[in-house]
Amino acid sequence: MPDKETTRIETREYASSPCCMQEVIPRYGTELIQPDAWADVAPWRKAERKRLIDERLAVDAEGRKVKSEKIASRLDLTIGKVSGRIVSGYWPFRGEPDLRNWAIKVIERGGRIALPVVIQKGWPLEFRVWGPGDPLERGIWNILVPSHGPSVQPDVVIAPVVGFDDANYRLGYGGGFFDRTLAAMPKRPFVVGVGYAGSRIQTIYPQPHDIPMDVIVTDE
């Protein structure tokens, strides 16, 4: 995960400004929005997603480093003991908090780190064990993933958020991978959303398929 690490790499929108959803859906809030309202919610989410990603990409490298370190400290308090547990992390993408050094410390404290891998669009994620020096390849969206390694069921899932609300619903990239994966897992892990405090929104207008995180950890 550190920059000095040697990594083998194999290379195998109704864009509009966010609308006033309280006018589109009068009873807005954290209750589930019914599927027939999806035609209104989907373009709103797309616009909100773009706004939030643009905002976090505008943060400079030093600012992102400071925010990531604060999130890492709060993760330690939230998760507690990691020895003997499998924690699913992620490889940072598009300005997400960089928790790679924190993941290495999890391994040093007796835990195991797994990274999510997209096997095929529309399928649940696979979690592969990763450690420093293990070979990586570019997966979907050009994100680095373990090129091989055992598939495991994590005890803790760290899910980066684009946005989040007070009910712990996560706004992601729109692929539905985390929701699909959590719904398919035989035993629910402890699910921690991580993101910047500025990514908080009033509601994501949750749909029946949206699964809330157990907790959201931010830099504030």
Kindly give the residue locations of the regions a language model identified.
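N-terminal active-site beta-alpha-beta segment that forms phosphate/nucleotide-binding
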Residues: 2-152
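Conserved phosphate- and dinucleotide-binding cores of soluble alpha/beta proteins
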Residues: 4-5, 9-14, 35, 123-220
